Amino acid sequence: MNVLRFCAAPLAALALMVCTSAFAHDPSEKVTILQDEMLKNVPGKKALMIKVDYEPGQSSIAHKHEGTAMAYVLSGQIISQVKGEAAKTYKAGEFWYEPAGSEHMVSKNASATQPAKLLVFMVLAPDEKVLIPLEH
């Protein structure tokens, strides 16, 4: 019975979030893991390659990565801003680097009418988180 009392409030909040999101447009991007491999020449580290698909107007939440990230715009245009730097628009074929722990304040599709795709390559330890939401 104590377990039920302990879980009731969090479960009710979760149910409310799920019901609310069913009526709202999903603002988050689609992330696809393309490759996830341990690096034999760098003990204790792995390489992760992901594709990020943004629908028109979509954006990521403010976040940071525990690992080093390198991003390449496959199609469309992406607006990216790391804390302490100005926002920059990257076009297809352009790329940038984010040191481990950088706070990524803005990552979004620059277009309200066209989709955009981003290829991200990361190097991190197997127990490090790919994305940590920022509380701002």
Stretches found by the model and what they are:
Residues 27-62:
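A short glycine-rich, His/Asp/Glu-containing loop-to-beta-strand
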Residues 86-87, 102-128:
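Ligand-binding loop in jelly-roll beta-barrel domains
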Residues 9-19:
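Bacterial N-terminal signal peptides
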Residues 39, 43-44, 54-55, 84-101:
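Short acidic-glycine-tyrosine-enriched beta hairpin
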Residues 67-85, 94:
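Glycine- and acidic-residue-biased ligand/ion/polar-headgroup-sensing regions
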Residues 20-26:
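Sec/Tat signal peptide C-region and signal peptidase I cleavage site
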Residues 1-11:
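Bacterial N-terminal signal peptides that target proteins for export
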Residues 59-61, 79, 96-109:
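Histidine-centered metal-chelating micro-motifs
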